Regions:
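Extended, small-residue-rich solenoid/repeat segments and analogous flexible loops
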Residues: 1-56, 139-151
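A general boundary/transition motif marking the beginning of the first structured unit of a protein
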Residues: 3-4, 101, 105, 125
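Intrinsically disordered, low-complexity regions enriched in Ser/Thr/Pro/Gly and simple repeats
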Residues: 17, 26, 107, 111, ...
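Residue-level marker of intrinsically disordered, low-complexity segments enriched
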Residues: 2, 7-9, 48, 75, ...
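Glycine-rich hexapeptide-repeat left-handed beta-helix
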Residues: 60, 65-110, 115
Length: 151
């Protein structure tokens, strides 16, 4: 995992200020950035422009991506929705062969998400929606994220 450059850190710091409407804040513009292997764990990238960035191998564990422009970004990122009881967008990333999900207030692994859905919703209508999403994530993983050799 590579450390962020000084410039990348400054962009994220200005973005954090922008999110809080603080002086000196500016929306992150990381269009086309080479973020391969970057440690973006827990970064708040809400509404950031990441269009066309290379995120292969980046650590996105816990990263908040709601509203981010990910069009053309390369990496193991999936977003879809709205789903479930809160009609939230689900954000799915895969790092180090582990799938992570952020949906509403939930953040954890696919296994933890599956257990939480069963515990909270069982076979209710929302449980069925979430279980369909889980199957979609598994199918997407099998079809798109299994062959790391091509990256």
């Amino acid at each position: 995992m590579r450390e962020l450059t000084k410039k990348e850190i400054e962009i994220l710091q200005r973005h954090a200020k922008w999110l809080k409407n603080e002086e000196g804040g500016e929306r992150a513009d990381l269009r086309g950035a080479d973020l391969r292997g970057a440690d973006l764990q827990d970064a708040n990238l809400r509404d950031a422009n990441i269009r066309g960035s290379n995120l292969r191998g980046a650590n996105l564990r816990g990263a908040y991506l709601r509203g981010s422009d990910l069009q053309g970004a390369a990496g193991k990122i999936l977003s879809f929705g709205s789903i479930g009881s809160r009609q939230e967008i689900a954000y799915v990333t895969k790092t180090e062969q582990i799938i992570h999900i952020r949906c509403g207030c939930f953040y954890g692994t696919l296994k933890e998400f599956t257990a939480k859905v069963e515990e909270e919703h069982g076979d209710s209508q929302y449980g069925k929606f979430y279980k369909a999403a889980i199957e979609f994530i598994k199918a997407h993983d099998a079809a798109c994220w299994q062959d790391d050799a091509e990256e």
